[in-house]
Amino acid sequence: MTFITRWLFSTNHKDIGTLYLIFGAWAGMVGTALSLLIRAELGQPGTLLGDDQIYNVVVTAHAFVMIFFMVMPVMIGGFGNWLVPLMIGAPDMAFPRMNNMSFWLLPPSFLLLLASSTVETGVGTGWTVYPPLASNLAHAGASVDLAIFSLHLAGVSSILGAINFITTAINMKPPALTQYQTPLFVWSVLITAILLLLSLPVLAAGITMLLTDRNLNTTFFDPAGGGDPILYQHLFWFFGHPEVYILILPGFGIISHVVAYYAGKKEPFGYMGMVWAMLSIGFLGFIVWAHHMFTVGMDVDTRAYFTSATMIIAIPTGIKVFSWLATLHGGTIKWDP
């Protein structure tokens, strides 16, 4: 098997997982370099970069690189690809060729994001890309358009990956294995994939409307034509809040396995409680988004609802934390470095 055949045309979940891990490591170094620039600018009085726009571009790029090209490829693409088939005894992922495409959409997406920083004045909008700052008035030129296309590609990659993981986790188990016998990491990736499948299309819609506002004279987010910039915020945060749970849920799964192993236990405390806590967190994550928007002004009843719903998430999260503590309790703890 030639090098090209193995790495470019792979249909092997382990090879594709390795590609994801390597890509994530490289992107992580880019993201770290960007955060170093941020700290260098803020770590002393006066200016270092000397230009507010450049600083905002660095902050925006740092966020996108770390979220879409480091955490998600490593946690979902890397660990997910490597571990999910192994943990359920499947020969590979449900759709191995689509798995390959999910990975190879990421380098072009990364390239578009880097390009967005180098043309015109860059994307100095913050990772939220709110209009009217992201409009063709405040950000003329191709920068924001390139960033939008970058997000489109990363989004397609993640949606395809999500379909793959959902199908694999549900359908590729041996007949004797019920869903409630799969390891917690498999559950965490399954729930993460469901969140991706439900939230990313909304982001795609929002940024596509922003794209047409910028280039095709639509006014989805422009009051002059009957639009509303607040609509963009709702669309963005309906994705943006589940996204932060997408980033942390695979970590919850990993922590459960790590804690059980280092406590010398064969399983974590309260398996069913852990599963339902993750399911609850995933569900509740979709009905709290407007807490990111309190400063734009909201009805008192709306504020009360979003505040209460947000606080409810603390309950399943607490179940997870105390189950980890209960797993450690009474264990023969391995103090490996």
Curated annotation (Swiss-Prot):
Covalent cross-link site, 1'-histidyl-3'-tyrosine (His-Tyr): 241-245
Chain residues that bind O2: 245
Membrane topology: Multi-pass membrane protein
Binding site for Na(+): 41, 46
Reaction catalyzed: 4 Fe(II)-[cytochrome c] + O2 + 8 H(+)(in) = 4 Fe(III)-[cytochrome c] + 2 H2O + 4 H(+)(out)
Pathway terms, separated by semicolons: Energy metabolism; oxidative phosphorylation
Residue numbers binding Cu cation: 241, 291-292
InterPro entries noted in UniProt: Cyt_c_oxase-like_su1_dom, Cyt_c_oxase-like_su1_sf, Cyt_C_Oxase_1, Cyt_c_Oxase_su1_BS
Subcellular location: Mitochondrion inner membrane
GO cellular component, one term: respiratory chain complex IV
Group of enzyme by EC: translocase
Enzyme Commission number(s): 7.1.1.9
Family recorded in the similarity comment: Belongs to the heme-copper respiratory oxidase family.
Protein name: Cytochrome c oxidase subunit 1
